Amino acid sequence: MNTLVIVLIAAVVLVCAYAFYGRWLAKTWGIDPNAKTPAVKFNDGKDYVPTNGWTVFSHQFSSIAGAGPVTGAIQAAAFGWLPVLLWVLIGGVFFGAVTDFGALYASVKNDGKSMGMLIEKYIGKLGRRLFLIFEWLFCCIVIAAFADMVAGTFNAYTVTDGVAALSDAATTNGAAGMVSIMFMVFAVVFGLIQKKFNFSGWKEAVLGIVFIVLSFVIGMNFPLVFNKATWSYITFVYIFFAAVLPMWLLKQPRDYMTTFMFIGMIAGAVVGLLVAHPTMNLPVFTGFNNASLGTMFPILFVTVACGAVSGFHSLVSSGTSSKTVENEKDMLKVGYGAMVLESMLAVLALCVAGAAASADGTPAAGTPFQIFSRGVAGFFEMFGVPVYVATVFMTMCVSALALTSLDAVARIGRMAFQELFSVDDMEHAEGWRKVLCNTYFSTIVTLAFGFLLTQIGYANIWPLFGSANQLLSALVLVTLCVFLKVTGRNNKMLFPPLIIMLCVTFTALVQRLIAMVKAIQAAASTTIPAGETTWGAVFIANGLQLIIAILLIVLGLTIVVNTFKSYVNSEKNSEKASA
């Protein structure tokens, strides 16, 4: 099938979903353009900052459009491109966008409270504590993984037999690294200029584009050739500042500039597919069971993840975006709009991978990021863009997909740690509680734990990320159901995605648990040849996953049970009130 047809179908579906279903949700739940948003009521110049709608949209989109939509869609294509396409469209429209919009809406209507605080208000304190612990650990794991990914992207060296040498991509990677650093520098300049002159519309856009061009010109002419360890240190220093500095000074302007770059990447992919209209070479459907991934249910849903629905998105919606929305009318494009655009990115990644596959359906060699990067860079080259420029641009885009999520999750992790130990009257808090809730202390603890995971092997627990992410989305849907019910709003549209996500999550966790038990049993009953592995290594890799899988199941069930009780109580209270 022609990839152009797939892109056009997806575009029509997603645009119609935003125009009709998204607006129906906004009308059903109730949007008040005259209401004071938390950003206006609690403007503190740091976390609560009134910001125009398109800037908040750029923050939301660049923060949620991480590695997931590209890697997930391409990896899940092992089941065939049609199941992936269907789930991205159905999941994006009725699951992901609804969850993101709902989380943003609930937070804005509750003074910018994060999801953990909403759980306390509508479900109970136990649910809040459990959720915040889960959220913080989740953020630390993402910090470790994405920081390692960013450092690896900029790394200019390869190590062979213990000897480091410059890689073939040293100049390209170094240039992308320098571009990224200039993005950070110009973001601060952008923020200061915006603070003084309050540019908007075309003036703001021109300023952002000028800084983007300058960043690439400087970066491509003065590449920074560092090893992975050095880039890792630089990355953690950056996300420390991104987590503690006021939103307007670094995070928002950098996200705004990055969104323009992402739009350029998406436009390049779309125009390339329009002009070349290559054939989708990946198979339509390969079966309900894949030898390497497992059964299509629930693995397809867990693997596609961010391209259709992601719990992490809700943390961004309720953690940062809700505190910067200037007017409630902007919530639709920020919450629902950013998600459907990410679903479009997942479709484009699928089509690029399909075009790169061989005629017999064999996937292209390399990681999903490499396949996508090479494919889009090839489209740019087709239009006369020099190979070096196209490669640096796509390397920067790939790193930015991870980096913009990384700085967001660092800030969210810091806030989760603070909320875990906070009380209502924090102004009079003293002693250990005041220290633990300090912005700088909580940031250092969060990043230190994330850095520790990069050193001791986060990969041992990373396979559970997909299930944990989907569990997060299920818990958010559970909370939104109670919120809408208690506040007298229609919540029926959440029941189908909630039930399906609970089934997906717990099935995936149970499958993982069984697989880990079998792996440990096999290792215990087998004599492992010397030099291959050890019992300790097997237990660390599988035993740790087993423990975490059990904890996730217990956590999920505990919150679901408490939510059910709260929901039943709200039903009884409403019946008494109407009697």
Features from the language model and the residues they span:
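Transmembrane helix-loop junctions in multi-pass membrane proteins
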Residues: 2, 69-70, 82, 141-166, ...
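Extracellular loop-to-transmembrane helix junctions
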Residues: 2-19, 76-107, 116, 175-187, ...
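Membrane-interface loop-to-helix entry segments
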Residues: 16-30, 134, 174-218, 228-275, ...
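Membrane-interface "cap" regions at the ends of multi-pass membrane proteins
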Residues: 16-70, 259, 295, 299
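Flexible loop linkers connecting adjacent transmembrane helices
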Residues: 23-49, 72-75, 85, 89, ...
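Loop-to-transmembrane helix boundary motifs in multi-pass membrane proteins
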Residues: 125-140, 337-344, 390, 419-455
